[in-house]
Regions:
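NAD(P)-binding Rossmann-fold cofactor-contacting core
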Residues: 245-259
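Glycine-rich Rossmann-fold phosphate-binding loop(s) that bind the pyrophosphate
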Residues: 230-232
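N-terminal Rossmann-fold NAD(P) dinucleotide-binding loop
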Residues: 235-236
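Glycine-rich, N-terminal phosphate-binding loop and its surrounding beta-alpha-beta segment
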Residues: 41-113
């Protein structure tokens, strides 16, 4: 029987492979890899039939080199301490790589949500929030959860409401969690953010003529085919945006069955490929666009939501009307110079200022584009080019080391 593959060990194997390209003190690298805090809690909840069930849950804060820490909460019967530690580490490196100023965290509750009523799920969520609050593992300046596998805006609204009741004097209390409904301080565009980020990332990878030539492909998305495994929130929106860009979807796999494509792989999930498998794929010439870059859309837009909560102003409110007036003035000048008239409907269409969702999507696109440029630049620095995952880890490690250096704690 083969030994169990520990998720956290796999993340550290990726880290070590990247660290070998760099010249940083061993102690500093060990500090970056270490999971700073893990809280395992067990609490009872009363089920609808009056019976009591003990619930096990975790919250891991991998790195406090930036505060608050940030990471989702998943509800799944397979949740365990190793998993939340690994996922919190990936969040640390993901945030550093895309320059979102958070440390990494992750949480999970070990339940199969199909076995619980909505009322029971609400009681579990609120009690979990209380336990986090009691131990100082939640707050807009401390640790900010978000949705993950098995959770969504409804669970985040329960968390926010519970925190508001516990921290009544915190004016920034809504910033304690992201992925909330828009009516409760959420941001437009958050639901589809991770899938949209996957699309932006794949688009950037396919835009490189040199990289595509190595795979025997032309640059660009048009005419390419894709198979999407899993049609949850991420898979659905990634498939939709890819299809809109001219990609032909030739397979959509769910738990009932799956189809594999041996040439193009983009990791929308967290840690779907082991370190050994990643190395084998690279040696076979398969391009793997790594998870810590490709699914960073969620945390990027969560960052925008957090900023909105702290500023107490929705995006676009300050500048929308000014931009509309400026654009209208420019259009009027162009009409005079060209002698071509536009209808009022055309003027409105061309001059309308950005809405909140427009600004959020623009910020997400900018993040994904510039982050991929940094990954390609890091890869090209070395005589033996590392794969994209290793290059992404290199970018993240150097960002974190720079933070410690700025703090004067480490050389």
């Amino acid at each position: 029987m083969s030994a169990e593959i520990k998720f956290f060990d796999q993340v550290n194997a990726h880290f070590d492979r990247a660290a070998a390209f760099l010249d940083h003190p061993k102690g500093l690298l060990e500090q970056i890899k270490t999971c700073n805090s893990v809280y395992h809690m067990a609490f009872p909840i009363e089920k609808d039939d009056g019976t009591i069930e003990v619930i096990h849950a975790w919250r891991a804060e991998h790195s406090q080199h930036k505060l608050p820490t940030k990471g989702g909460i998943r509800y799944d019967h397979r949740v365990n301490e190793d998993e939340v530690m690994a996922l919190s580490a990936l969040m640390t490196y993901k945030c550093a790589m895309v320059e979102v100023p958070f440390g990494g965290a992750k949480g999970g509750i070990r339940i199969d949500r199909r076995n619980f009523s909505e009322a029971e799920l609400e009681r579990i969520t609120r009690r979990y929030t209380y336990e986090l609050f009691r131990k100082g593992f939640i707050g807009p300046a401390v640790d900010v959860p978000a949705p993950d596998y098995g959770t969504g805006p409804k669970e985040m609204s329960w968390i926010a409401d519970t925190y508001l009741a516990l921290a009544q004097t915190d004016v920034n209390a809504l910033g304690c969690v992201t992925g909330k409904p828009v009516a409760q301080g959420g941001v437009r565009g958050r639901k589809e953010a991770t899938g949209r980020g996957v699309y932006f990332g794949i688009r950037e990878a396919c835009a490189s003529a040199a990289d595509m030539k190595k795979l025997g492909l032309a640059a660009g998305l048009a005419g390419k085919t894709a198979v999407v495994q899993g049609l949850g929130n991420v898979g659905y929106y990634a498939a939709r945006f890819l299809a809109d860009a001219g990609v032909k979807l030739v397979g959509l796999a769910e738990r009932e069955g799956s189809i594999a494509n041996p040439a193009i792989i983009g990791e929308g999930a967290n840690g779907p490929v082991t370190a050994e498998a990643s190395d084998r794929l690279y040696r076979r010439g398969v391009m793997v666009i790594p998870d810590m870059y490709l699914n960073a859309g969620g945390v990027t837009v969560s960052y925008f939501e957090w900023l909105k909560n702290l500023s107490h102003v929705r995006f676009g409110r300050m500048e929308k009307r000014l931009e509309e007036r400026t654009n209208r003035s420019l259009l009027e000048v162009v009409q005079k110079l060209t002698g071509k008239g536009l209808s009022e409907a055309e003027i409105r269409a061309y001059s309308t200022g950005p809405e909140e969702e427009d600004l959020v999507n623009s910020g997400l696109e900018e993040t994904m584009v510039t982050s991929y440029e940094k990954i390609r630049a890091a890869r090209s620095r070395f005589r033996e080019e590392p794969d994209l995952r290793t290059a992404a880890f290199i970018v993240a490690i150097e960002m974190i080391c720079g933070t410690y250096g700025d703090m004067g704690i480490f050389p």
